[in-house]
């Protein structure tokens, strides 16, 4: 008998991300079983756009990146979480890799490379790529930690981690 596919929650923290959020949410369409957006009182259309993609939007003050991301994870219904920033999107290859993991994960967390777009150019040098990130994890084995704003996923001891093909596309710099 084949195990059923795991359900996947996607978490995103936001503040005035109307220019990014649709691209991010479009990239997880057909992959996410639940989307939780924790918004820090945006004054633009971030919340409305997120809701138009079916996201559950929770508004609360911003206590810091780590605290806000852990709060978002705590609001999810499923054990498996894909944590994204609003200025990120999945490449098609990464999306396919995650779909394979949904059929039966072998590890408690997964790394993949993040590729940054700087003013319209993909940066694959200067130490910016590969930029390995652990963003897909079983929340029973992981928590956000580190120092704000440089958050990292801290896995429980003896947790196993794998690596997925495909890039997390990072659109953080629109201009110089």
Predicted regions and their residues:
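N-proximal low-complexity "stem/linker" segments adjacent to membrane-targeting elements
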Residues: 1-27
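Residues at the starts of beta-strands that form the adenosine-phosphate
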Residues: 7, 33-34
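Acidic helix N-cap motif at the loop->helix transition within catalytic regions
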Residues: 22, 44-53, 93-94
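A conserved acidic beta->alpha catalytic loop
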Residues: 27, 31, 39-48, 85
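Short, structured coil segments at secondary-structure junctions
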Residues: 31, 52-54, 132, 157
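Conserved donor nucleotide-binding strand/loop of the catalytic core
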Residues: 33, 47-75
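Catalytic metal- and UDP-sugar-binding loop of GT-A-like glycosyltransferases, i.e.
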Residues: 38, 60, 82-86
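Catalytic-site signature of metal-activated, phosphate-bearing donor transferases
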Residues: 70-73, 80-84, 91-176
